[in-house]
Amino acid sequence: MTEKTCPCGDGKSFDACCGPYLSRASVPVTAEALMRSRYTAFVRQDISYLRTTLWPKNLRGFDEVATAKWAAENHWTGLTVLDVQKGGAADREGTVLFEARYLSGGKLNTHRECSRFRKKAGNWYYVEALAH
């Protein structure tokens, strides 16, 4: 992966992929695009984007300092999308199963999660991690 390649693993350049979302120039039109952009936000330590794309009712429990610390302490090495259920441009809800790989304390780890997303007023939001 080069600096110009988007960290989300979609194969596009950052400017043609998640860059417009993180700069707030546009919004993701699918749940998968939002999930990929949130992964990229972790890689780039853009905690305000993570907060902005969190389901509004869950904002109270969001710990910005702890999230920033965790993002900074880990070196993100890759993302693999395993499954997508709904979450298209015409949907209001969807789920994305993924694996995010990262180095922490010299050890390679894999975070596997099935994320639930919901769309409100044309914007997708991360709601929660589901049991999988």
Please give the residue ranges for each predicted region.
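Short, low-complexity N-terminal intrinsically disordered segments enriched in polar/charged residues
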Residues: 1-37
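A short beta-strand motif that forms part of the nucleic acid-binding face
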Residues: 12, 21, 100, 115, ...
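Hydrophobic pocket/interface hotspot
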Residues: 17, 50, 117
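Short helix-adjacent coil turns
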Residues: 38-49
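Short, hydrophobic secondary-structure boundary micro-motifs
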Residues: 50-52, 127
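Short solvent-exposed beta->alpha transition segments
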Residues: 52-81
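Surface-exposed, charged secondary-structure patches
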Residues: 70-110
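Short beta-strand edge/turn micro-motifs at domain boundaries
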Residues: 110-132
